[in-house]
Amino acid sequence: ANAGNVQYTLKGIKGFFWKGFLYKLEKNFAHKLVVLLSNLKIVPKIEIKFLTNSVIAKYTKKKNIFNYLRLSQVKETMLVNSRSFDIFKNDTPEVNENQIVLLDEMLNTSEWSRFRNPIHRDKINEHYFKLTKLLRALSNMFDKEIVICLHPKDDFDLKKKYFEDFRVVQHKTRENICKSFIVLFFESSAIIDALLLRKKMITIISKVMDQNQIDGGLHYHKHAGIMIINIDQNLNFEKEDFLKQLDEITKKYNYYINTYITP
C-alpha cells in the first residue's frame, strides 16, 4: 500500500452477518492479544512506527491513561512523508494532461468477498457496460484518449475484453497518472500520486459494489472533497460547469496532503 492513503474500517455486509462477525472477531482479538502479550513482555514491542497520518500521530502524544501507562505496543512513533512525495521530490516525472485515466477495481477479490458472496457475472457485465459508457462520454467531451490502469494482480486478458475500445495497461499506473487530465478510480492508494500532482479526480460507485467498496471511495470524497459519480444514474454533463467543478475541487486537496501525505 502507498503510505498516505486514508485507512478505513471494513465492516460486515447486510445479509452476511457471520462473515462480518468472524472477520471483526479475528481482527480485533488478534490486535488486542498482541497488545496484551507485548505489555506482559511475552512478545517484544515495536521500537518505532513510521506514520504519514498526523491525526494518529497527535493521538499517540495525547495525555490519557493509555499513553501515560505506556500500554501501546509501539514505543515511539515518527512522522514521515509519503513514498509518493519522496519519489516526486527526487525524480520529477513528465507531467501533462493528454489522457483520461481509469484505475479499475477488482470487484471479486478475497478482500471484498470475505464479507459477501461473489458478484454474479451478469451484474459485472452490466457494471462495465455503464462504466465504458461514461468513459466514452468523457473521451468525446474532452477529446482525450482513455487509458485503463490495472492492479498488478488483476486479470489483464479479461479486462481487455471489457475495455476493448480503450488502451489497457498494467504496472504503469504512476506514469499514466502523470499524463492524466482526469483520474477516475474506485478505491486505490495509487491516487496519492494524483493528489500530489493536483489532478482532477472522480471516484466511481455503482449498485454492484458492496458497502466496503463504496466506502473506500467515499473516504476520499470526505477527506479530500473528490467528486463522486454513480454510473447507475442518468449522466448529463455540461462541459464548462463540469470542468469548473473539477478545478474547484483540486483547491481542496491541501488539507488532505498536509494531514496525510506530507505532515
Regions found by a protein language model. Name each.
Residues 1-89, 191:
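Active-site and donor-binding regions of nucleotide-sugar-utilizing enzymes
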Residues 48, 99, 181-182:
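Structural motif
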Residues 102, 126-170, 217-224:
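Catalytic donor nucleotide-activated moiety binding site of glycosyltransferases and closely related
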Residues 160-164, 189-262:
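Catalytic binding pocket for nucleotide-activated donors in carbohydrate/polymer assembly enzymes
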Residues 86-110:
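Nucleotide-sugar donor-binding and catalytic loop/hinge architecture
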Residues 82, 144-197, 201:
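Donor nucleotide-activated moiety binding/catalytic core segment of transferases
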Residues 2-6, 81-85, 170-175, 206-211:
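Short, acidic/turn-prone active-site loops that include or flank metal/cofactor-
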Residues 108-130:
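A solvent-exposed, charged loop/short amphipathic helix patch at secondary-structure junctions
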